[in-house]
């Protein structure tokens, strides 16, 4: 996926209020593209996040906060920060085998599983 396509996906995700940050990771967990540098995701954090997804761990860490993984399969991820109110993580594998991951604000018009489905739909569009 090239940067122009990534930016198109970010625009599609931003059609709904609440997307705080979007990342594209490759299969090794390296950051290919990111939508902002406000709260930068480190390479180590990206690799740990992808490892938690692939190995179906019960939780993941993002920006030093724990997110309970509520949905975790080969193509979709949905995780919620329950205790700290830090929002949600929704992700999907893309057609080319990369991983599109969005950090979502805690209060939006959609619930987490709807976000997970939406991120998947955008990733496969």
Question: Residues of each region from the PLM?
Answer:
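Non-catalytic interaction/Regulatory regions outside core domains
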Residues: 1-125
């Amino acid at each position: 996926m090239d940067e122009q396509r990534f930016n198109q996906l970010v625009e599609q995700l931003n059609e709904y209020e609440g997307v705080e940050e979007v990342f594209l990771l490759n299969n090794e967990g390296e950051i290919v593209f990111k939508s902002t540098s406000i709260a930068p995701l480190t390479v180590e954090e990206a690799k740990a996040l992808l490892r938690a997804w692939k190995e179906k761990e019960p939780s993941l860490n993002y920006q030093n906060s724990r997110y309970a993984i509520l949905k975790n399969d080969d193509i979709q991820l949905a995780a919620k920060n329950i205790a700290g109110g830090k929002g949600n993580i929704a992700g999907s594998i893309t057609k080319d085998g990369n991983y599109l991951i969005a950090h979502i604000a805690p209060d939006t018009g959609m619930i987490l599983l709807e976000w997970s489905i939406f991120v998947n739909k955008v990733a496969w569009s």
